[in-house]
UniProtKB/Swiss-Prot annotation:
The active site is at 110, 117, 148. One of its GO terms (biological process) is tRNA splicing, via endonucleolytic cleavage and ligation. Keywords: Lyase, tRNA processing. One of its GO terms (cellular component) is cytoplasm. NCBIfam families: endA. The gene is endA. It comes from Thermococcus onnurineus (strain NA1). Belongs to the tRNA-intron endonuclease family. Archaeal short subfamily. This is tRNA-splicing endonuclease.
Amino acid sequence: MKEPIEFKLSGDRAFSEREKAINQLYNRRYFGEVVNGKLFLSLIEAAYLMERGKIKVLDGGKELSFEELFELGRKKDDQFDIKYLVYKDLRDRGYIVKSALKFGSHFRVYRRGMDEHSQWLIWVVPENLRFSANDITARVRVAHGVRKNMVMAVVDEDNDVVYYKIEWVKF
């Protein structure tokens, strides 16, 4: 088994300056974002890669366990659990998953590479969430404006994910 790539915790992200990290994780598999020669991962990306034994994350020199990293994610985001489930499901299906905060959603999703524009915006919601029609309308309007499909990822109490595509219908 290959040695996990070392990352360091920095706020709500983990980073590595190692060229191996950039080549293996960003250039080949589209994880994270490269800024000034460093590969930055969100906590969700870091947890996903850590769970698979691809990386290890250090906080002040101490190696974190998967559970410790996950707990940090929970402290920073009360929906970390369900977002992670959706992220993991999409990545395991072979999709490329990136943040979509600037689009008012949780994730943007690419088919199998990032040569083209992303096709979907994913809004992650727990099964019992109450929301208004305006919540949906606003998200669909943004998705339509940037030529993407709006998908609601509903996570039930058994941690199963069901995807619903939401679109405008013109009569």
